[in-house]
Amino acid sequence: MAIHYFFENSKKPKFITASWKKLLKAVTDDENHKLRNVNYIFCNDEFLYAINSEYLNHHTYTDIITFDNSERPKEIEGDLYISLERTADNAAKFYVTHAHETARVMIHGIMHLCGYKDKNPDDIAIMREKEEYYLQKYFSEILD
């Protein structure tokens, strides 16, 4: 099991700690997936915009892009790019802390690696339900 943090054009916030890795591993365990290798690459808006444009042909800002590198069912490997500028803006918009919103987005990426989608209203509702469930179950004590 390996979760790695990398920072591109972005400074590491104090709230992102090694202990979060255990909590994210617990999420994958609850979803009956084996965590192999997940890289969280934290960056700024422009860095993620460039990735979104180049690889997905989307010319918009986003909070996360998940690249699923899994080779076997129920085994998780991937690269998750997260804009800390976008999570900070969204935190203010949703009246939550930056740590809370970043944890939610990190869980969101894990849910994608577990096979959840968010392209239609029903899928979005399921994704939001999962995010909230795992935020409450594993992150509530450290985010309060």
Label every model-predicted segment.
Residues M1-A103, C114-D144:
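An acidic/histidine-cluster motif and surrounding catalytic segment
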Residues M111:
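Conserved ATP-binding N-box helix of the HATPase_c
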